[in-house]
Amino acid sequence: MSPRPEPRALTAEEENYAASLWEIHREVTPSAVAMSFAGIVYETETHDSRQLEQKIEPIARFFGNAERRVGGLAVPASLSKAHGQYLEAMALYRKASDEMLAFTKDGGRQHLIDAQGMGLNASEDILRAGEVLWPGQYKPH
């Protein structure tokens, strides 16, 4: 099996975009993990929907803001696909957190199931975009 080819170096414009996105990204990963853990703790330990709501509300606000921040970045044409993947991930994380909050209101378990699927898809989108923007980055998923 031949070694994987080295990714091409980013242009100055691409590097500026990647650095701007990194400022958002470094908050995305812990927020996504916190959202997952809040759901796990609810399911396995507390079954306290009020506590779940208190944990998810700030995460939902973060993802709404992150989606707007990512959407507002100036994107080089060469990175439009990666940008689209990342922006879709932010939308999915926002929708997932909204689903979890909906669960705290009506108790409909389908909200949690849907949120889990959205979170997984968002994580995959971020990994794909990250391969282009930050090749070689440690991926804990």
How should these model regions be labeled?
Residues 1-5:
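Amphipathic, hydrophobic N-terminal targeting peptides for secretion and organelle import
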